Amino acid sequence: MNKLMALLIFSFISMPSCATSPPANPAWINARIAQMQKEHPGNPPLSIWQYRYKGQTVYYFPPQCCDIPSTLLDANQNRVCSPDGGMAGDGDGKCSDFFKTRTEEKLIWRDSRSR
């Protein structure tokens, strides 16, 4: 009986979990985070956001200061557009619907260092 109980306990413990781990960031995102951590802290803090936009996963890098535009990249690190920022504050005009149509917002990383 003890052997049967031990076998059942071992079987239960060694069963694979049904929970799935979240998908890992692309390697280039991790490289960008490492690079951003080497820079001086931004004000506002540097951050990377993931969204779904026009049927694809995209990564949004908010503007940091003044007239610097934001950057929106696809999952292969190709530049999609600049949704905001720049001289007029409304980006390059190539994705003016981004803020209205984006979905599945996920914060990938935010710099926790203070300036």
Protein language model annotation of sequence segments:
Residues N2-L4, C18-R115:
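N- and C-terminal low-complexity/disordered segments
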Residues L7-M15:
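Bacterial N-terminal signal peptides
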